[in-house]
Amino acid sequence: MSTLPPGPSGLPVAGSTLSFVRDPFSTYERWAEEYGDIVATNIAGRTFVMVAHPEHIERILVTDQQHYGKGSFQRDQLGDIVGDGLLLSEGEFWHEQRNRLQPEFFREQLTQYATMMVDETRARADNWTSGETITLNSELQHLTLAIMARTLFGFDIEDAEGQFANTARTISERFNLSHVSTYLAAWIPTPRNRRYRRAMNNLDTVIYDVIEARRAQDDSPNDLLATLIAAVDDPETDLTDETLRDEIATVILGGHDTAALAMTYTLTALARHPDAEAEVRAELDEVLGDDDPTVTDLPALPRLDAAVKEAMRLHPPAYTLFRESNRPMKIGEYDVPEGATLTIPQWVVHHDSRWFESPWEYQPDRWTDEFEASLPEYAYFPFCGGKRHCIGMRYGLMETKLVVATLLQRFRFDFQLPELSFAAALTLQPAEPVSVRVTTV
Ligand code: HEM
């Protein structure tokens, strides 16, 4: 006899929809408290199974990964945006594309990007005047977009900034788990869907312009865009310009908003924890003095590393993963039907007191070698894990640390909101603009 996981019951359509849509974060937490590590529920007619124990998560992402695909829930939501790009593609096609793109994220390449990252950060910060209030999350989103455009696609974002303005946020909002329409098709003409359509059109225009300009260029830089264009132009492959568009959209959307959030949450956490901030500043003074940070400095900055790691624990930019079982599976003692949508919430696991003492406190000091050695593998997984782990993990971590270090060397950030609150969009968005006053140090 099959044993389904426990979970909240209710009318089949409304099911758990209302409470979840009202507040996905506390609903996830409540389910974990009431029903345990594996919880089944029905949201807008779809079976969701939340899995929140590191051992089960490891089975899904690593040991049994061949039985869990990216799934129809994610494809319905994101298929339009990222198409057959790396995030959603599967099987042999995914494997070949991953191998093709991976070298762009190797250590030697990253070293070349580091200087551009610091240069772009300085240029952005030069626009800030001491004493003014800025919207930190938007500033950092523009910055990471500019960094990505320059390092991976060799173009200057200023040419396209107008078209890009708010694109990522609009697209991320379309996925907001707190809106009933997220569970409905994107073609239904709600105002949010219309904004989303416009953002998508802008994104496509920019991407196709960039491809065209690069093809017309005589001496192309040796970057991710060059690698992708060479693959499409290679008669041995049957890749098309559409594949190219999908990979570019995937990298842009997967890579800049997440990194901007990691930076936002690190800087706001430090601004609210003066002791932790003082330790990071003292370390930067000692190791860097007035010099710009370089990639070789990073291993000498353990406090900065812990500050970022802890911010990504407390506020994981990708706050939940989704997978779909492609055959009936057993998770722990429960049966999970074929086609169930699994939700694997970093939000719950990173705040679980079984793994993290005082889980809601920002405590960078917890990240000692002994603590890390004692932590179950999948109690902390801001970049996912297994074969589908984030291809941009090293890039994103390096970028976050270089940007945070460069900004702290120049400014003090005074957080202007009473609290941070969050929206469960595609990524963990701040619910309100993050206003901070910047003062030159
Ligand atoms: C620093 C912040 C970042 C975070 C928190 C983050 C998080 C993640 C997570 C959780 C996944 C797995 C998604 C899933 O399996 O459903 C992922 C995948 C991915 N990320 Fe990131 N990411 C970050 C930065 C980046 C950067 C900088 C890039 C590109 C430059 C990038 C590109 C991608 C791509 C292409 C995938 C799909 C990989 C595949 O399935 O083969 N990410 N990321």
What kind of region is each of these model predictions?
Residues 70-75, 93-94, 109-261:
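Cytochrome P450 heme-thiolate monooxygenase catalytic core
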Residues 274-276, 373-375, 393-429:
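Cytochrome P450 heme-binding "Cys pocket" and the immediately downstream C-terminal segment
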Residues 1-96, 111-124, 143, 155-159, ...:
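N-terminal membrane-proximal hinge/A-helix region immediately C-terminal to the signal-anchor transmembrane segment
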Residues 258-271, 403:
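Short, small-residue alpha-helix embedded
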Residues 5-10, 114, 118, 219-226, ...:
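Cytochrome P450 I-helix active-site segment
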Residues 66, 322, 344-371:
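Conserved cytochrome P450 K-helix/beta-meander segment immediately N-terminal to the heme-binding cysteine loop
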Residues 17-36, 291-332:
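Conserved cytochrome P450 K-helix E-x-x-R motif and the immediately C-terminal K′/meander segment
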